[in-house]
Amino acid sequence: MLDLHQIIVSIIIGVIEGITEFLPISSTGHMIIASHWLKIDNENTKILEIFIEFGSALSILYFFHKKILRILKFNINVKKTNTKNLHIILAILPTIFFGLLFYKKIKLLFNTYNVMYALILGGIFLLISEIFKPKKYKTCSINDISLLQSAIIGFFQIFCLYPGFSRSGATIGTAILLGIKRSVAIEFSFIISIPLIMGASFYDFINNMHNFKILDLPIFFIGFMISFIVSILCIKKLLKIINRTSLIFFGIYRFIISGLIYFIN
């Protein structure tokens, strides 16, 4: 019989992930904070978070699947694009390399205090991106993103390994500083997130399989489905919000949350 408390927790964490994944405020950071405040910060929760993150990744894949098919040239009925697979590889390779190299050390950073500092640093970066962005866009289409731009975005994406910094915040902020149109920056950011989130979820699961219990699968599935459904329902609206809202607003929000963490803890 399913435990009601576990079901409620699974739903709460799933909703948090489904909403925060598409905003530059760090979904991982918010899940860590929620787990701590709900007093469920244990090994079992790590497995739950893996399933939940995978759910949001699938929603991104579903939402952008047509664009991804164009980029990968799997669909012969669509117009060919200039964005090659190499752009995606350059954008994700640095994070994969450092993520694997420092995997155990990175996991030691998964606590509320480190998230608090990362929220502040990420907030400062968002402010810098908005204040010092070029007055005119140099890149107005995802097909026009250069290999150099992809590589630079990939380098700054490394900061997302610090829980609480925000992967989308790092990539969107960097892209905007490089003169990439905001809507294009958002689109590219989430397309390159798919292999990273799915790969990280799989690798985390392999490393935490000893904590996996088949009896907990229904709870994990509930979290997965809640995350997927909420993400599907929210993604279009939230992406519009990012496109129309100054990054300064998200930076201020991050400062407020980090302040709450400090005073509550």
UniProtKB/Swiss-Prot annotation:
Pfam families: BacA. It catalyses: di-trans,octa-cis-undecaprenyl diphosphate + H2O = di-trans,octa-cis-undecaprenyl phosphate + phosphate + H(+). Bacitracin is thought to be involved in the inhibition of peptidoglycan synthesis by sequestering undecaprenyl diphosphate, thereby reducing the pool of lipid carrier available. The chain crosses the membrane at residues 7-27, 45-65, 86-106, 108-128, 145-165, 186-206, 214-234, 245-265. Its EC number is 3.6.1.27. GO terms for cellular component: plasma membrane. Disulfide bonds: none annotated. Belongs to the UppP family. It comes from Buchnera aphidicola subsp. Acyrthosiphon pisum (strain Tuc7). This is Undecaprenyl-diphosphatase. Keywords: Antibiotic resistance, Cell membrane, Cell shape, Cell wall biogenesis/degradation, Hydrolase, Membrane, Peptidoglycan synthesis, Transmembrane, Transmembrane helix. Catalyzes the dephosphorylation of undecaprenyl diphosphate (UPP). Confers resistance to bacitracin. The gene is uppP.
